[in-house]
């Protein structure tokens, strides 16, 4: 099996198959067209440029195409890139499939669903429990398959469920320390806060934003879903209003995409643990790619900072 692209060092040659995650056309300073390809395997992805692109190349090297690549890893503007020597589409007889290139969550889907189901089972407030169970059941397949984002954090198969399970464990630890928190409300907020992404995003492969995702966003999508669920279940209670508030406020600030700031305790904690889990996985993924004593590439979503891996972290 070929070494994952994230394990290759600068100067090494690469000769392996990739899945094209995205393909974007550009015009070089000499006026000639080129394609920026994001090439993906199970370890991560790397950018490559296809210079002097022909008109047919846009179709030949479109997203979700499997390609055979020969190239060299080099460093450019703080990030690794792949300098292409040769690229071609994979043939039908080459025994490769899209599944071979998809990064997946480290916990099996059935285990994650069992965890989510157990947290719902433990809820004591019937209104919160019924709404949460209803929406999880409605979108169970997508919930277990979709990434949590198109980029930046948990952008892999089952990333949404993995993000939620990690946050549930954080929520439990915090609620153990601060018993005044409403566990049912906090757990429901964790489970539902990003569920609108099953409509906002296109799916787990070559993830992009849907029309609904671009025009509405996952927050407003989920508020609408909550209203529908409450109506179908004939629940007319304040819990519905507070759950909507948790969804609307989980990004924390208007400049981060929240229509409202957190105004109940559980909304504040939901925002913190969402932010914490997203940042932790971004740091961990960046640090996995470097050796002790080295700095990571700059992480745009973390104020474009680099992170250092101490030499005693062998």
Swiss-Prot record:
Q: Which organism is it from?
A: Bacillus velezensis (strain DSM 23117 / BGSC 10A6 / LMG 26770 / FZB42) (Bacillus amyloliquefaciens subsp. plantarum)
Show the SMART domains listed in the entry.
HDc (SM00471)
Name of the protein described by the UniProt record: 3'-5' exoribonuclease YhaM
- Is Cell membrane found in the keyword set? no
Instruction: State the family named in the UniProt similarity comment for this chain.
Output: Belongs to the YhaM family.
Using the record's annotation, list all stretches that form the HD domain.
163-279
Pfam families (alphabetical): HD
Provide the GO MF annotations for this entry. 3'-5'-RNA exonuclease activity
Gene Ontology biological-process annotations = rRNA 3'-end processing
Entry's Gene3D superfamilies?
Hypothetical protein af1432 (1.10.3210.10), Nucleic acid-binding proteins (2.40.50.140)
Name the EC number(s): 3.1.-.-
